[in-house]
């Protein structure tokens, strides 16, 4: 039995869960999320909780048990409270600016980069910090990873984009030649 999968997911007030096999729809104050459930697990709605159970003991259903529970839990958390990821920009001349759903990034290249945020993700810039908000944790994490990939922090001077609180392993540079 999966230690994660067997735990019930409590549904907070203001969140509505509906199951139309195989589509699970969760509505809350922040928005609506829907996801197709795999056929190897069963979703049960019981008095203020969602339970995920395996159909059989096959390797596939055992591996999906905890995954599906975590995905549904993230959906419930997203529509009730939402998720936030912060990115930090470090480097001389590196700047960011947010206009509507477009991030204008100046990252030391010969041209500015215009990054269009996907629907459902909001971005704000405060000095050298990019704050991304959304209800879909998967889409939010993928968007943050794509922004970070534009100029990842390099190990010598630490310039680039990093997650807030991320530790960059620093390296020492070359030493001068000995004559």
From Swiss-Prot:
Gene Ontology MF: a single term: structural constituent of ribosome
Entry GO terms, CC: cytosolic large ribosomal subunit
Pfam family, one: Ribosomal_L6
GO BP: any one term: cytoplasmic translation
SUPFAM superfamilies hit by this protein: Ribosomal protein L6
Keyword S-adenosyl-L-methionine: no
Keywords: Ribonucleoprotein, Ribosomal protein, RNA-binding, rRNA-binding
InterPro entries for this protein: Ribosomal_uL6-like, Ribosomal_uL6-like_a/b-dom_sf, Ribosomal_uL6_a/b-dom, Ribosomal_uL6_bac-type
Domain of life: Bacteria
Subunit record text: Part of the 50S ribosomal subunit.
Family statement drawn from the similarity comment of this UniProt entry: Belongs to the universal ribosomal protein uL6 family.
Biological role: This protein binds to the 23S rRNA, and is important in its secondary structure. It is located near the subunit interface in the base of the L7/L12 stalk, and near the tRNA binding site of the peptidyltransferase center.
Protein name from the UniProt record: Large ribosomal subunit protein uL6
